[in-house]
């Protein structure tokens, strides 16, 4: 299944800002945005960020919704995460024989 993920945090919870200010609970750079690499259950197809808005976007592929939730769980502690199942409209159009018509 394909999923579209949007992760949004605020400047107050921004891990980059916390690290720059020397917060004792700040994650090391290697741990920030680890989700970009995916894992055994979730393949990240595209990942992008709009840093000035503290917002990230991703298209991922996984067998189960729960696998995507687990991958993005660390982001859920600092802001809102929306995970939407998606249909592959390109594959659908091709499989229906309508591609190029």
Residue ranges and their predicted role:
Residues 1-53, 63-65, 88-101:
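Short S/T/G/P-rich N-terminal loop/turn motif that feeds into the first structured element of a domain
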Residues 56-57:
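Amphipathic, hydrophobic secondary-structure cores in small proteins
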Residues 61-95:
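An amphipathic, aromatic/His-enriched active-site/gating alpha helix that lines ligand/cofactor pockets
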